[in-house]
């Protein structure tokens, strides 16, 4: 692609509005970077589908040359140069590393990184299902229609306007997409819970019961039940989710609607639930939670695992940007939002809670303790 000579000359000479040619070229590069941002996701998706992380990992400690990778992938030799170009951007993004191979002269080889380790399909905390789920065309399609959606006067989400059904209804009608989504959420849960259980140990000591609201198929409930065998754990979710699931000694599944009733417990646990809902819906859920727990003096509290969006001047650029990406994903799929501390506080006060503590120990997410 080549710019028209007159346009290129105009940019280099400035635009007549006080902007220098260098400033305009920098602005142009900034725009191009965002135009092509989607390529990072697609390149990563391609690498995972080709099993490149597995090949590099299994070849350790030796680096894998391009020719060896072509052979391992069983792709046409004619596409070697294209594979090199794919790897080049993934090395630039930090997903793979490159090194000189001494025994092969100046030939280069590829090595895995910590990020690519988390993309291994058999890794207990693999992020591959999350990657493949969130870049699935069904999930991305609503974002193509944001501008049309903003002009609509109804209360449909972009997902509903695109696919003719809400996200949850769509999953009920397309089991394979529900499975993809559940796998995506499961991988996030496994990674986070390894930290949560360590960080929550002191927060859960002394309690006798806990209910995991919207706990799905019980990944969190099982982890807590195993880590705290003296705590009675209850997983609450809709009948179609938990109706056929069986518990264990200190774990049970209960069918129900969190907007109507939450089983009594010392602690109510909400992992990535409230960000799915708008403020009015969140307040309803929080009020049901407050009804389910004892007073603060008796040890009652909520534990919320969710995002607290960084203030403009706090947190790294990358982490804040990722939080904002999450927020627009929620806008596309559901009625929810990622919230700042101020926005969380308004919800807690409106639902009748008196205090809260935020512990930012989960990377992009935080542990929020809320007290009646």
From Swiss-Prot:
<dbReference type="InterPro" id="IPR001077">
    <property type="entry name" value="O_MeTrfase_dom"/>
</dbReference>
<dbReference type="GO" id="GO:0046983">
    <property type="term" value="F:protein dimerization activity"/>
</dbReference>
<feature type="binding site">
    <location>
        <position position="214"/>
    </location>
    <ligand>
        <name>S-adenosyl-L-homocysteine</name>
    </ligand>
</feature>
<dbReference type="InterPro" id="IPR016461">
    <property type="entry name" value="COMT-like"/>
</dbReference>
<dbReference type="InterPro" id="IPR012967">
    <property type="entry name" value="Plant_O-MeTrfase_dimerisation"/>
</dbReference>
<protein>
    <recommendedName>
        <fullName>Pluviatolide O-methyltransferase</fullName>
        <ecNumber>2.1.1.323</ecNumber>
    </recommendedName>
</protein>
<dbReference type="InterPro" id="IPR036390">
    <property type="entry name" value="WH_DNA-bd_sf"/>
</dbReference>
<comment type="similarity">
    <text>Belongs to the class I-like SAM-binding methyltransferase superfamily. Cation-independent O-methyltransferase family. COMT subfamily.</text>
</comment>
<dbReference type="InterPro" id="IPR036388">
    <property type="entry name" value="WH-like_DNA-bd_sf"/>
</dbReference>
<dbReference type="GO" id="GO:0009699">
    <property type="term" value="P:phenylpropanoid biosynthetic process"/>
</dbReference>
<dbReference type="GO" id="GO:0032259">
    <property type="term" value="P:methylation"/>
</dbReference>
<feature type="binding site">
    <location>
        <position position="257"/>
    </location>
    <ligand>
        <name>S-adenosyl-L-homocysteine</name>
    </ligand>
</feature>
<dbReference type="InterPro" id="IPR029063">
    <property type="entry name" value="SAM-dependent_MTases_sf"/>
</dbReference>
<feature type="binding site">
    <location>
        <position position="271"/>
    </location>
    <ligand>
        <name>S-adenosyl-L-homocysteine</name>
    </ligand>
</feature>
<feature type="active site" description="Proton acceptor">
    <location>
        <position position="275"/>
    </location>
</feature>
<dbReference type="GO" id="GO:0008757">
    <property type="term" value="F:S-adenosylmethionine-dependent methyltransferase activity"/>
</dbReference>
<dbReference type="GO" id="GO:0008171">
    <property type="term" value="F:O-methyltransferase activity"/>
</dbReference>
<comment type="subunit">
    <text>Homodimer.</text>
</comment>
<dbReference type="Pfam" id="PF00891">
    <property type="entry name" value="Methyltransf_2"/>
</dbReference>
<keyword id="KW-0808">Transferase</keyword>
<feature type="active site">
    <location>
        <position position="338"/>
    </location>
</feature>
<keyword id="KW-0489">Methyltransferase</keyword>
<comment type="function">
    <text>O-methyltransferase involved in the biosynthesis of etoposide, a chemotherapeutic compound of the topoisomerase inhibitor family. Catalyzes the methylation of (-)-pluviatolide to produce (-)-bursehernin.</text>
</comment>
<dbReference type="GO" id="GO:0009611">
    <property type="term" value="P:response to wounding"/>
</dbReference>
<feature type="active site">
    <location>
        <position position="306"/>
    </location>
</feature>
<comment type="pathway">
    <text>Aromatic compound metabolism; phenylpropanoid biosynthesis.</text>
</comment>
<feature type="binding site">
    <location>
        <position position="237"/>
    </location>
    <ligand>
        <name>S-adenosyl-L-homocysteine</name>
    </ligand>
</feature>
<dbReference type="Pfam" id="PF08100">
    <property type="entry name" value="Dimerisation"/>
</dbReference>
<feature type="binding site">
    <location>
        <position position="258"/>
    </location>
    <ligand>
        <name>S-adenosyl-L-homocysteine</name>
    </ligand>
</feature>
<keyword id="KW-0949">S-adenosyl-L-methionine</keyword>
């Amino acid at each position: 692609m080549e710019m028209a000579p007159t346009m290129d000359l105009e940019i280099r000479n400035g635009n007549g509005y006080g902007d220098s040619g260098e400033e305009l070229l920098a602005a142009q590069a900034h725009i191009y970077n965002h135009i092509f941002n989607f390529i990072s996701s697609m390149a990563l998706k391609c690498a995972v589908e080709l099993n490149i992380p597995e090949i590099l990992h299994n070849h350790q400690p030796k680096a894998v040359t391009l020719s060896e990778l072509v052979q391992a992938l069983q792709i046409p030799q004619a596409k070697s140069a294209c594979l090199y170009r794919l790897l080049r951007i993934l090395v630039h993004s930090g997903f793979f590393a490159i090194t000189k191979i001494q025994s092969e002269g100046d030939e280069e080889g590829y090595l895995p990184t910590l990020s690519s380790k988390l993309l291994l399909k058999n890794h207990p905390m693999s992020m591959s299902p999350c990657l493949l789920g969130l870049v699935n065309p069904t999930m991305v399609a609503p974002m193509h229609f944001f501008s049309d959606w903003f002009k609509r006067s109804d209360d449909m989400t972009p997902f509903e306007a695109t696919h003719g059904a809400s996200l949850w209804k769509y999953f009920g009608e397309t089991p394979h997409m529900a499975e993809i989504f559940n796998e995506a959420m499961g991988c996030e849960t496994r990674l986070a819970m390894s930290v949560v259980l360590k960080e929550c140990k002191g927060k859960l000591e002394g309690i006798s019961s806990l209910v995991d609201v919207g706990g799905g198929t019980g990944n969190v409930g099982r982890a807590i039940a195993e880590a705290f065998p003296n705590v009675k754990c209850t997983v609450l979710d809709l009948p179609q989710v938990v109706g056929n699931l069986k518990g264990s000694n200190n774990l049970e599944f209960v069918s129900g609607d969190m907007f109507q009733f939450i089983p009594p417990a010392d602690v109510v646990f909400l992992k990535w639930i409230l960000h799915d809902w708008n403020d009015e819906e969140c307040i309803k859920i929080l009020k049901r939670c407050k009804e389910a727990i004892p007073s603060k003096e008796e040890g009652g509290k909520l534990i919320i695992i969710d995002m607290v969006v960084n203030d403009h001047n706090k947190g790294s650029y990358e982490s804040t940007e990722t939080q904002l990406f999450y927020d627009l994903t929620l806008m596309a799929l559901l009625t929810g939002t990622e919230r700042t501390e101020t926005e969380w506080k308004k919800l807690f006060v409106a639902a009748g809670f008196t205090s809260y503590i935020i512990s930012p120990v989960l990377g992009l997410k935080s542990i929020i303790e809320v007290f009646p």
